[in-house]
Amino acid sequence: MKVVIIGGGTAGTATAAKLRRLDENVEIVILEKNNEFAVSNCSFPYYISGVIKDSRQLIGATAESMKEIYNTDIRLNCEVEMIDRQEKTLRITGKPDESYDKLVLATGAEQLRPDIDGVLSEKVMTVRSLRSIRNLKDFIIGNEVRKVLVLGGGYIGVEMAESFVKLGLEVSLIDAATHVLPNFDADMAAPIHNILRGRGIRLYLQRQIAAFDEAQAVLSDGTRLDYDLCLIATGVRPDLRLPVLAELEIGERGGLKVNRHLQTSDKDIYAAGDNLEIENLITGRPVMFSNASLAVKQAKIIAENLSGIGSEFSPVVGTSITPVFDYTAAAAGCSEKMLQDNGIDYFKLNIYQNTHAGYLPESGQMLFKLLFAPDGKILGVQGLGQNGIAGRIDTIAAIIKSGGSVAQLEEAEICYAPAYASAQDAVNNLGSLAQEVLSGKIRFAFYDDIGKDDVFLVDVRMPEVFQSGHIDGAINIPLAAIRNNLDSIPHDKRGILYCNRGVGAYKAACILDNRGFDNVFVLSGGSNLFSEIMEDKSQQ
């Protein structure tokens, strides 16, 4: 059997490697249109910032090593023009046709380049290939660049903006959305915005670039920004030129449609990586999800199917993670917008918790948001903090993958020692609070509830803390004084209790609930999150 793989990125090389480990006799050919392959696009920001010194470190393998270790024929500078499905041949630019028994499309995605006046200027660049990232760095060094625009607030946009700041450049980030990082909700994006602004990045949200001239970019609201360089980071779309020419079926989201075995509408043609649609575990709907980890999993499934092992690619949770200077932002599952778009009912809550025992000097703060269904099924989680975020999000993602509920979060056995976690870890607390929400024991209010006419706002912190600053309209009843001030809290209004992080307010709410108050709420995320959101709004 002869297997030809079009594309030498993560999906293509991983397919070849796994297939060779399973079958020593199969003939494997990789056709790559560029002169380099196995390039780690995800590491481009680290090359720009100088963490990675040599661009050759971005290359994960060479044609020689793939030949020696995996007996794979790597052909660079081979661009496939057309797939002849009837004859099972590939037309290659300037080279003889190539036959195949089985074909794997690992063509990835292509950079979206918006149609903007002046976008073809040499000062307006994209980064999708090794050549392009080298050109970008050379341009910065050779042209005394000081002012940089980043168009696009997704993961690559935010990471590249950070890298430019680390080079000492002035950075403005422009995005048409209301907030950066689309897998996050607005409340969780607010502190991320504040971190970015705190490091000097100017945010221009709900705006686009309308035109470029030689010295300035004109935004959709008329704002003019000086620039020496603009990076286009507006996302990618599947590279479907070959599948469309071959009349393979395209899915409803615009990606290549595949079955659970990752076969296209032609059973002899498989696909892996950024060019295909996959099923979202929570919504049951097709999604486009660019992720190297998923590409490797898909490569394994294809290799096993080509070797006669009947493997299936299961629906995905959808995980993501990115550094934001000294912080880590990570998410798994659905955001509120995704749930709303798919008509899925949900509850939500936010909590702050220490990374580990608070009495240790290295302890930091983490912020989490949990989304869950009325039946307790976990729908999504988002986290932000300086330490400890990845492990918690991964744990919850694994529970989501297994179809788990909030009860399993509370029951999860998390490694404990004071230097690593609290005795009641954030994962457990999220599950515990979610179960109390479902039972009606606790009710949460949110930042947009503040200021409504039917709300009575109570700050349960100590008087000296209250005097140093509080939410407008709040009265102060310290937690220890709640029982002696029951008459001060009306029954005919929604009582919203808050403290810094929500712990004291939760304790006060339990007291009031046990005293017959059935209209008491805890401000989700406390005044800390409320302040982050208000600060963000004040800067917009």
Residue ranges of model-derived segments:
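Rhodanese-like catalytic fold shared by cysteine-dependent sulfurtransferases
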Residues: A407-P418, S422-A445, I450-F456, M462-I496, ...
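Beta1-alpha1 glycine-rich phosphate/pyrophosphate-binding loop at the start
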Residues: M1-T72, L112, A161-F184, T319, ...
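A Rossmann-like FAD-binding core segment of flavoenzymes
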Residues: N25-E27, I69, I74-I92, D97-E98, ...
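N-terminal Rossmann-like dinucleotide/flavin-binding domain of flavoprotein oxidoreductases
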Residues: K18-K102, D185-R202, K337-M338, N429-S432, ...
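Mid-to-C-terminal Rossmann-like scaffold of FAD/NAD(P)H-dependent oxidoreductases
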Residues: M1, G7-G8, N275-N387, S422, ...
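Glycine-rich dinucleotide-binding loop and its adjacent helix/turn
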Residues: T107-L167, R202, V258-R260, I475-A481, ...
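FAD-site-proximal beta/loop scaffold in flavoenzymes
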Residues: L120-E144, A215-V218, R224-I301, T395, ...
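Rossmann-like dinucleotide-binding cores of NAD(P)H-dependent redox enzymes
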Residues: I59, K147, Y155-A210, F289-L294, ...
